[in-house]
Amino acid sequence: MGCVCPQDAKNNEARNEFYQNNYEIEQKIRTNKTLMKCLIKLQRKVKQHYYRKNRKNLNNENEDEPLTYKHIATNKIDQKQLEELFKIYPPLNDDIDVEVRSPAQFSNKVIYFGEWDKNKNLRHGRGIQIWSDGAKFLGCWKNGKACGKGKLIHADGDVYDGDWVDDKPSGYGTYIHSDGTRYDGEWKSDKQNGKGKENWPDGTSYEGEYVDGKKHGYGIFKWADNSIYKGHFDNNNIHGKGIYAFADGREYNGDWVKNRLEGKGIFTWPDGRKYDGDYKNDKKEGYGIFEWPDGKKYKGEWKNGKQHGIGEYYDPDENTWKKGVWECGKRIKWIDD
């Protein structure tokens, strides 16, 4: 094989290795810190919602306490709200004989005003329920439980508006947090299940599939700086095949394991550089090919993000490949065939 001028080759290799490793560090910081910050924020918001919902069962806050009630003064419930509710939601028309009663206060201090099943003495039809902390539900009831369309306004200002089944959000609904974070999509048994979209006040968004309240399946996550990930999620983690496009033009297309680059992947830079090969724990490791925009190439072994082991270096000016040994990103020696 032909030879390369030793000093020029070393200078070029050193410069190229520096740029490549510098971008590797930037990429690692971006992936681990910015990405995880958004994912944790999303997961925390969802968990807060579940805790509030579990604390505030629509049927009875204390299941061991008998569901007794007493009539209270009508002025404690806004009569106009009930009238508006009747305009929004039509009668159930399920052949149940219902009647509108004056407001009733249960032994747990929950107040209900609306329609009742006359025979079973259960909330049934359209009604308003208010908790002692100011939380309020306006919507439809069946057999004593929230069922159908309804809106739950939490004491802290959070709002869920959508479908209900047996006191739990199920079907399609919108949840708006007091800070402006919003979810529109499908629910099942009080958890996000199916397809949905979340939006944050800073412009961050996620649209895709959910299972039991977590991102699971295919989804698209966009950051406020216009970075975007399109691919698979598993148990609220980026996991599987996916493409991450950085705001500065860099792009990674390949395998992910729990929010980290791991497996086979292709990483490209806007200036024309490209790496195609193995990754482990966010770093190049295994076999890979690195190409520079001036035509130079390295193919061979990598470890901890650097050339390490036996590899081949291509010089386009000489149109030659030369085999060598690299250690921690530096060429140690050439190997003569």
Where are these regions (language model features)?
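Intrinsically disordered, low-complexity repeat tracts enriched in Gly/Pro/Ser/Thr and acidic residues
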Residues: 1-337
